[in-house]
Each structure stands twice: as C-alpha cells, then as structure tokens.
Amino acid sequence: MTPQQPEIQLIANLVVRRPDGRVLLVRYHSDDERWWLPGEDLEPYEHPDDRARATLDRIGGVAPSSFGLAFVESFRGRRGWHVVFHYRVEADGKPDGDHAGEWFEPDDLPRTVHGRWEREAVRRVLE
C-alpha cells in the first residue's frame, strides 16, 4: 500500500513591529480571547509576498516602513504539513481593519492561540 501524500498548508505570517518595539497581535474571532500573529493561508500558486502584503492591507491603519522575509520553517501540524513564511514588518499606526488588533511588548505577550510557537517566531524574527 502506498502512503497517502500529506496535505501541505502554505502560510504567510507577519511579525509587525512599531518603532517603540511593540509587536502587533490580532483577534480573528471575537468570541475567542486568544491572540494571533497576523497571517493567512496562501491561495494556490500565490506568492508568499503577495499574501503577506494582502494580510497587512486587511489589518488596515498600519503603514509599513520596511517589509521582508525573515525565515521559513516547516513542521507537521494538525492538518498536515505546514510551511510558514515569516515576515518582518516595521510599521506604525492604529489597526482599524477586518480584525481587532493591539500592540504588545514582545517579552510580555498575552495568551496566544499557538502559545510558545508564536513567542518563538517573534523572537526569531526580531533577533
């Protein structure tokens, strides 16, 4: 029997940092108290840069001064294999887009959906 090919999920993930060093987290679901790093799944054949910029546009009210790929990681997740493109964005402003957003000190992040993984992603992007 041939093993089945795993589902592969491609994700653009952003660590958005203000000049004062705070990072942006968003709430994708109003009934969930946990926070997320901004990010979205890529559409088929979409370039990660394009999805990252679209995610930033949906945040709204945040003006980037720099934008670039920081690192790529892959791991087995609950829904198959994940390939995550982590972007570092220097920006300022008040998020006013599709989802609630707030700025937090990187060393004092609130409860996040993925816990230690998000904290480690922030650390790696900002180092």
Describe the residue ranges of each PLM region.
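Conserved N-terminal beta-strand and adjoining loop/helix that marks the start
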Residues: 1-23, 41, 72, 88
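A generic fold-level signal
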Residues: 7-9, 18, 79-82, 96-98, ...
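Short, flexible active-site-adjacent loop segments at beta-strand->alpha-helix junctions, enriched
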Residues: 20, 29-30, 73, 93
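Conserved Nudix-box catalytic region and its N-terminal flanking loop in Nudix hydrolases
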Residues: 22-59
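NUDIX/MutT-family hydrolases
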Residues: 33, 88, 95-127
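Structural detector for helix-capping/boundary residues
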Residues: 40, 54, 67, 104-107
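Short histidine/acidic/glycine/proline-rich micro-motifs that form metal-
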Residues: 42-43, 74-76, 109
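Active-site segment of metal-dependent pyrophosphate-handling enzymes
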Residues: 57, 61-93
